[in-house]
Design a protein with these regions (language model features):
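N-terminal Rossmann-like or analogous alpha/beta NTP/dinucleotide-binding catalytic cores
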Residues: 1-138
Length: 138
């Protein structure tokens, strides 16, 4: 592992630790968050956001700070456009919150769920240890 050997991840973690100390916050647990807009299908860029955040989490731990990564899928965002390959009837639901639109294929509670499930699957396959959260969960 190269984390702990002066990578940019180590530098980011160092600056986070210093900032938290300067503002007087506890270092008992530092949360790192990665976000995904649930409008479209996750892609390499979406996964790289989660992977970079996980790298910062790991660098914090190498520097002795307990941390956790929360992957947040904002299913309260409005549906901006219907991704290619999705049913045309979804066009009548722009710009409603994704959590208020029924699942396009009947296998999830609402539109944002299958998108979030794809991100969870990608992070699991990438062996990224994170907690998952949807905006509609509060």
């Amino acid at each position: 592992m190269i984390i702990g050997k002066g990578t940019w991840l180590d530098k980011v973690a160092y600056h986070v630790i210093q900032r938290e100390k300067e503002v007087g916050r506890s270092l008992s647990l530092v949360r790192v968050e990665s976000g995904l807009g649930a409008s479209g299908i996750p892609h390499l860029g979406s996964f790289s956001d989660v992977a970079r955040a996980y790298g910062v989490k790991m660098a914090l731990e190498v520097q002795g700070v307990k941390s956790e990564l929360i992957s947040f899928s904002d299913d309260m965002d409005g549906l901006r456009k219907v991704p290619q390959g999705f049913p045309d009837w979804l066009n009548q639901h722009t710009p409603k919150p994704e959590s208020s639109i029924k699942g396009p294929y009947g296998c999830h509670n609402h539109y944002g769920c299958p998108i979030g499930a794809l991100l969870i699957d990608a992070s699991d396959k990438g062996e990224i240890n994170d907690k998952h959260s949807l905006g509609s969960e509060g």
